[in-house]
């Protein structure tokens, strides 16, 4: 599945998009675990990210399929 990254997540990985191999539908939490295995620099940021598929916000328990694109949104800060 494709995973789109923004902000500090993109900087930690060095790419705007990465692929995660899924054999079938899996909870978002498992996708995040796979990302940390491939990109350890993400681990400190993932507890605060919001997850979305399309226009729908998703929880970490929600299933995603290999054909979907998971979007990870870091918290926005500034003034």
Residue ranges and their predicted role:
Residues 1-78:
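Ubiquitin-like/PB1-type beta-grasp interaction modules and other compact soluble beta-rich domains
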